[in-house]
């Protein structure tokens, strides 16, 4: 959201949009309809939103599991991977009450073991999809935003101020 504010662009979160369209939380979708249904809803949201101009689109970590979503995200503009260690991701999840209440377990293990397991699958896809990688370890949010802005193509920054 802060990046969008700096660019003077709109901001949307795919998880929020899935919940809005479904009228249920992600946890409820997983519990009643399963992960495949959630991933299809997520895919539909990305397909709809990736065509919008001047939009910072925040996705859940699993959005890149779908090849069509990866293609659409890359075609839409720069894709930023906010990289962090397993421990940092775990700490951030525990510090965010909204994430704790909305996020279902993705494996039988949960916790740090789950994060490690999921990252082993997703990291190659993040690398494939990302045009910009920012290591967020030890950085404040304002520093992360500054690093992303440094890496964005100049033409995008010029467009944001016109």
Map each language-model feature to its residues.
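Short amphipathic alpha-helical segments
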Residues: 1, 68-71, 91-95, 146-147
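ATP-dependent small-molecule kinase phosphotransfer cores
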Residues: 12-74, 95, 99, 106
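Short glycine-rich anion-binding loops that position phosphate/pyrophosphate groups of nucleotides
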Residues: 61-63, 85-87, 139
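A glycine- and Lys/Arg-enriched "phosphate-lid" helix/loop adjacent to the NTP-binding pocket
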Residues: 75-123
């Amino acid at each position: 959201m802060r990046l969008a504010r700096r660019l003077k662009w709109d901001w949307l979160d795919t998880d929020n949009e899935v919940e809005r369209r479904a009228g249920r939380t992600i946890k409820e979708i997983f519990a009643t309809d399963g992960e495949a249904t959630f991933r299809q809803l997520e895919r539909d949201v990305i397909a709809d939103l990736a065509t919008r101009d001047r939009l910072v689109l925040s996705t859940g970590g699993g959005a890149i599991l779908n090849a069509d979503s990866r293609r659409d995200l890359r075609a839409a503009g720069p894709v930023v991977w906010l990289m962090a260690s397993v421990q940092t991701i775990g700490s951030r999840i525990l510090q965010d009450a909204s994430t704790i209440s909305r996020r279902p377990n993705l494996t039988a293990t949960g916790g740090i073991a789950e994060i490690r397991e999921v990252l082993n699958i997703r990291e190659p896809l993040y690398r494939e999809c990302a045009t910009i990688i920012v290591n967020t370890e030890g950085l404040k949010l304002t520093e992360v935003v500054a690093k992303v802005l440094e890496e964005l193509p100049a033409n995008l920054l010029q467009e944001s101020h016109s």
